Amino acid sequence: MTERRHTTPAIDVAVTDPRDPVARHCLRAYFAELAARFAGGFDPGRSISADDDELVPPAGLLLVATRHGEPAGCGALKLHADGRAEIKRMWVAPGARGLGLGRRLLTALETEAAARGATVLRLETNRALGEAIRLYRSAGYREVAAFNDEPYAHHWFEKPVEPTDREGNDPWTPPTSPSASRT
């Protein structure tokens, strides 16, 4: 399987092993920001897991964004056998905010989830993350009843997605062969 890269000038978004040093940097920065922004702090040990083994194929994946070679953001997927996928660990470095990177990461996660057969994406977030809540709403996520017992969550969202094949095509549309277009 060829991994998709979501690249534009100066910013590269790629599937990355969560044990990679750049991935570790992003995840540490994500946890530190949550600890600073949440009223009662943040302890990753109390949160619903997204362990390294859950963030590598086929269980899931971690996307890491770099800007000019430096860590700029991350986002993860946890895949479930019933067609659900969870978005986890969405973070954009302070110096990369305002560039649309959060939306790019979210769109890339949606693309990756659809390519892996997901039919619905879910996520939860904390009320202190107003910019994330606005992003999710503007991207078509709708607020739903709590679907887990995440102690740090105040908002739960979901969005249906159409599964695609690994190349980004609708799996329900048969491919056209080159000979079919000849007359």
What are these regions (language model features)?
Residues 18-19, 26, 119-122, 126-140, ...:
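C-terminal "cap" of GNAT-fold acetyltransferases
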Residues 99, 103, 107:
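Residues forming the Rossmann-fold NAD(P)(H) cofactor-binding site
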Residues 93-95, 99, 127:
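Active-site acidic-Proline motif in GNAT/NAT acetyltransferases
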Residues 69, 100, 117:
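Conserved G/P- and acidic residue-centered "switch" motifs that form tight phosphate/ATP-binding loops
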Residues 2-8:
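Short, conserved catalytic or adaptor-binding loops enriched in Gly and charged residues
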Residues 9-84, 88, 93-94, 106-107, ...:
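Acetyl-CoA-dependent GNAT
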Residues 106, 112-125:
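Conserved GNAT acetyl-CoA-binding A-motif
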